[in-house]
Each structure stands twice: as C-alpha cells, then as structure tokens.
A protein has these predicted regions:
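Catalytic cores of alpha/beta
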Residues: 154-159, 208-221
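Terminal or standalone catalytic/regulatory effector modules within metabolic enzymes
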Residues: 36-54, 285-291, 295, 299-466
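Active-site mouth loops of central-metabolism enzymes
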Residues: 10-30, 81-97, 116-119, 142-155, ...
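Conserved, mostly hydrophobic/aromatic
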Residues: 14, 35, 115, 171, ...
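Acidic, compositionally biased tether/linker regions
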Residues: 445-552
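Hydrophobic faces of well-ordered beta-strands that scaffold small-molecule active sites
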Residues: 6-9, 41-45, 76-83, 113-114, ...
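Active-site beta->alpha loop and helix N-cap motifs at the rims of alpha/beta catalytic domains
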Residues: 47-159, 164, 178-182
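Structured functional modules or segments
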Residues: 521-628
C-alpha cells in the first residue's frame, strides 16, 4: 500500500465544468497561498478552456494569469491540460508553434503537462511530447476513456504503450464523461500497472456519482494519483470533493496525510466566491445519471446549457442530448473531449435547431470527417461523408495531419505586428487571432508601469486609518504579477492600486464584493467598443422584390464576412453564387459555421458589418435567384 496523492482541479477543470470557465483570476489569488500549503501532488491551473475563455470573455491575459498563480504557489507544481497538436486551441498547429508554446508555458510556470489527443491518435502527441521532454517538465500522457463498440481495453493498453515510447513519465486515465465504473477502473489500472509499468493517475468526473468508488478501487489496484476539487466546485459535472476522498482514506493504507481543517478553510472561501457571483453548486440530476447513455462530459454539459441559452433555446436540451449519440455514431465514435466535444455537440445543436440534419456543418466537422484532425476511432457513415464532403477529397490514411500545417512563428509575428510585445503575445495570436487582436489592441501600451492609488472612505468612524505597509504590499502584488488592479477594504476604507494605463482584473475585498459584483459582471458581458450593435432577427419586408431570398443566421454568434482577417470577403454585392458556395461565417460555440447559398443566385444586399453580433434569424443577405 502507498499514500494516494491528490491533484487539485478547482481553478481549472472544476470551474470549467461547473462555471463555464468564467472564474476571474482576482477570485483565485487570495486563497492560493493556503492551497499551496495543502501538499497536493500538483494544482491544475491552466490549459483546457482556461486559455481562451479569459481572453474571450473576461478581458484577461492567460499568460499573466499563469504568472500570477505561480507567484502565489511557489511550493506546489502547477499542471496544465494540453490538447496535443491542438495545444489549447481547436485545430492543429505547426511543430514550431507547438514547441514554442510548450517552452513558453514551462517558462511561465507549468511543471506538469497532461497531454491528450481527442481521438487517441498517437501521431498527434509526438510534437508536444518531444517539446516537453526538452523542457525537463513532467510529461503525463492521457488516455481519453470512453465506451463504444470500437473502444476496448487492448486498444487503451496499446495507446498507453505509444505514450510510454514517446517518453511519458505517468499515464492518466481521463474519464471526462464519467463513464468509468469501479470494476472497469480496477481492471484498467491493473492492466496499465502490469503491462506499462508507469505511475497511473485517474481523472474522473462525478456526473453519475461513481467517481469516489472508482478512486477507492483505483488505489487498491495500484494507482498513485487521483483528481479532486474543493467541495463548492465539486460534484455534478466536476470532480469528487477533495474533502470526501481525504476523509474516506483516513486511517487506511492509502491515507493522503492532508489536513481536513485546512481543506475546509479553503472550501469556505470558495463558497463565498460562489455565493458572491451567484454561481451554482455541482449536483447530479436525472440527465447526469443518463451519462451512461448520452456520454456527455461535464465541461461539455455546462457549455451546452450555456450555448443553448444564448440561442434562446434552453428548452431544447433534451432534444440535443438525444441527438448527440446519433451524431457520434455517424462520425466513428470519437471520445467526447475537446475539441471533439465541441464539434459533435455543435453539430447536434445545429441539427436540432435548424430542423435539417447535417444541413449546416461547421468547417471543423468537415475537416474532421476529411481526416485533418486524425484517424477516426471507427468507420464513418457513408451517407454523412458524401453529404458533408461532396467533392472534397479525404486525407490519405498514411498522411500525418500535423505535417500539413506549416505556419511559422515569424509569419504570425509579422501578422501581429507591433501589437505583440512578447513571444507570448505572438503565440496568443497564433492560437486565437481574432481574440488576441481585440485584447492586444485594447491593452496596447509600451510605457513603464506607473501606479495609481484610489481611496474611498466607507467607514463609520472618524479615526479609521489604513496601514501604509498594506498599501506597499498591494503595489508589490501589482508589480510582481502583472495584474492591473488590486482592491481591498479594511478599517472602513476601500483602497485600489492600479497599474497606470492598464485595464485588468480586480481582487475583490470580501466586504465590498457584493457592491462590486454587478459592475464586474456588466463589464464582462459588454462587447468590445469596436463591435457593432447586435443585429435583430429578420422581420417581413415588402420593400424588396418578392422573388428575393432572405438569408438569415441559423444561430446566435458573430458574423464574419471573410475566412480570416486579411482575406477578401466571401461575397460582395453583385456576385453570382452557386448552390453550396460559402457566403459568410457565423462564429458560435467556439466553432466557425459556414452559411452557404442554397441555389444559384446574385448577391443583392449584404446586411451586416464584419464582426457584428447576430441573433438567431438575423438578416445576413438578400439573394436574387438566377432562373434559366
């Protein structure tokens, strides 16, 4: 028997699974020093959706976030989730970008890289594995666990051997959908220990409730590490609560040795954050228990709910949950993990909301079916392949998708121009060019940091004062971490230290949080200054010829007139288009969804400006049919 080690997932997978990755770094920093004292094997703090979500929704720089976390956790290794050739994005990147990103992540604070490929295609692990071994960081190779007619224990062991051959230091079983059961866990852990011989790390989502029993069986079978979250961010779609697992193993041969009282202090803090921001606890409902049917992972579930609400279609969740297994079977049973969870989930949403199965297909789904994400685990439905690809050729089986991506760092740096002031800025642009452009333009500055001090008297006593040493400490936090603003309240006075010229995130004082929260929420929800007003749904129009066709948006999202910022528009007024020709892109649910002409026509009106938000049914174009 050996002590079971714990990796904490609260500030990465916990919040991604329950809070749609909307936790601000200011909510994290006050508690990190206590988390650093727990004795975790590692704190998972970065990667997954915690790179693009802060950039996209919170106006935060993910690199600054990582540096700030590292500053407050000097004693505990920081871990990240890396999507192999996809890094923290949603498609393949070139070998050079992969190597530079891994080195930058390590340089900024990452000690443990958990690497997975959504298809368990070992080819998509090679570049990141080589880069990690160069840095000297720990390389944890992850198996995406799922249940399907084409996934077997032998497949998983063969894949684990491939990870070992690439230099993996540990093997993780990544049960992102909560599909593992106690006896499946026992068999898989034993097989990995006996046949691969590396330390085994088990990652389960609570979902249907079996995860704690899985962890007990995993420990008994020889697993060394499991993943948990602090109770306020545990259960439901997230991981089991650390307090539960630590208590369960007390006085056993697997006793973690972790102080429960310290864990409860940390949990009290996270519960305050949850209440202050009006966020939900993790719960297991009937739809969660049905995971053994729909196989939807925790993070995917919370995002699906959020996305359907954005589409004003929250009542269609049951329909989407029934559609997901159908789509998954038609495209070869990919494990539902990023980016495949987004690709399959979005296709299911589009099938349901449009009323036409496979009528609207995101470009990412088309690329997957063509083989550009890697090899599908099982056979694809021929009728779907024909409908989606048409005349587009599929990739030959012996071609490695990653070798087709040749974008260089210098090319990205040239595109970013003087908006990028560091390698990290360029890498951010390489992964998310539109979001990076918006963020870097807004925060453009090359001046030496100066500090501004704001003071607001809130007290009731005339003799209340603020300790000057505390102000010095606030300045030190801003200076050392790169965070733009820190606010605390003490002795009836609220003090804010702000880096001049920066618009960043604040650490809310507990007493001032209720007052500050609505403003913060409004700021997070507001569109960028450059964005136009959201286009309204189409209304009947008798001013145009009766034969003109109104093309409307099939979803809520952002309208893009061109495939990339520097490319020409798909169409212009007066252009003739044929059936199936792309008219524009609607970015929604992190995917690019092409809107196509349904018949030969002439473009008579373009109704929107580029990058304008749209609602479901918003007018995009008027087309005049061409009759022979």
């Amino acid at each position: 028997m050996q002590t079971l080690r714990i990796m904490d997932t609260t500030i990465r997978d916990g919040q991604q699974s329950l809070w749609a990755t909307r936790m601000q770094v200011g909510d994290m920093l006050p508690i990190l020093s206590k988390m650093d004292k727990v004795g975790y094997w590692a704190i998972e703090s970065w990667g997954g959706a915690t790179f693009d979500a802060p950039l996209r929704f919170l106006d935060e720089n993910p690199w600054e976030r990582l540096r700030a976390i590292k500053k407050h956790c000097p004693n505990t290794p920081l871990a990240m989730l890396l999507r192999g050739q996809n890094l923290v994005g949603y498609h393949h990147y070139s070998k050079e970008i992969v190597f530079r990103f891994v080195h930058a992540a390590h340089r900024n604070g990452i000690d443990v890289f958990r690497v997975f490929d959504a298809l368990n295609d070992i080819r998509n692990i090679r570049d990141s594995a080589e880069a990690i071994k160069e840095t000297g960081a720990l390389f944890e190779g992850a198996i995406c666990y799922t249940v399907s007619p084409v996934h077997t224990l032998d497949n998983y062991i063969e894949y684990a051997q491939g990870l070992k051959d690439y230099g993996a230091d540990t093997i993780a079983i990544k049960d992102m959908a909560g599909m593992l059961t106690p006896y499946r866990t026992e068999r898989m852990v034993k097989a990995l220990r006996e046949e691969i011989g590396l330390p085994v790390h088990v990652h389960c989502h609570y979902v249907g409730g079996m995860a704690p029993a899985n962890y007990i069986k995993a420990a008994e079978a020889g697993a060394e590490i499991v993943d948990t979250a602090s109770a306020p961010l545990a259960f439901g779609n997230s991981q089991p609560a650390v307090e539960m697992i630590v208590a369960a193993l007390k006085e056993s041969g697997y006793d973690t040795g972790i102080d429960l009282d310290l864990l409860f202090e940390i949990a009290d803090y996270w519960d305050e954050v949850r209440e202050r921001n009006h966020l939900k606890r993790g719960v297991s409902s009937l739809i969660h228990m049905q995971v053994y049917s729909h196989q939807v992972p925790g993070g995917m579930m919370s995002n699906l709910v959020s996305q359907l609400e954005q589409q004003n279609a929250g009542d269609r969740l049951d329909d989407v949950m029934k559609e997901i297994p159908k789509v998954r079977a038609e495209v070869g049973y990919p494990p539902l993990v990023t980016p495949m969870s987004q690709i399959v989930g979005t296709q299911a949403v589009l099938n349901v909301l449009s009323g036409k199965r496979w009528g609207v297909v995101p470009s990412e789904m088309k690329d997957y079916i063509a083989g550009y994400y890697g090899k599908a685990p099982g056979p694809l439905a021929p009728e779907v392949v024909t409908k989606v690809l048409g005349d587009m050729p599929a990739l030959e089986p012996d071609v490695w998708p990653s070798e087709l991506v040749t974008t260089t760092y210098d090319e990205v740096a040239a595109e970013a121009g003087d908006l990028a002031h560091s390698e990290e800025d360029v890498l951010m642009w390489a992964l998310f060019p539109n979001e990076a452009r918006t963020y870097l333009s807004k925060h453009r500055t090359s001046e030496k940091t100066e500090f501004m001090l704001e003071e607001e008297y809130l007290g009731t006593k005339e003799d209340e004062t603020v300790d000057i040493n505390q102000i010095k400490e606030l300045i030190k936090v801003v200076e050392d971490t790169g965070i733009g603003e820190v606010t605390v309240e003490e002795a009836g006075v609220k003090v804010t230290v702000r880096a001049k010229g920066e618009v960043a995130y604040a650490i809310p004082a507990a007493a001032a949080a209720t007052e500050a929260a609505p403003a913060a929420a409004a700021a997070a929800a507001a569109p960028s200054a450059a964005a136009a007003a959201t286009a309204a749904p189409a209304a009947p129009d008798s001013a145009r010829p009766a034969n003109w066709i109104a093309v409307t948006s099939p979803m809520v999202g952002t309208y893009y007139s061109a495939p990339s910022p520097d490319a020409p528009d798909f169409v212009s007024i007066g252009d003739e288009v044929v059936a199936g020709q792309s008219l524009c892109i609607i970015e929604a649910m992190k995917l690019m969804n092409e809107v196509k002409a349904e018949q030969m026509s002439v473009v008579r009106e373009v109704c929107l400006e580029n990058a304008q938000p749209v609602e479901y049914g918003s007018l995009l174009f008027y087309l005049e049919p061409i009759t022979s």
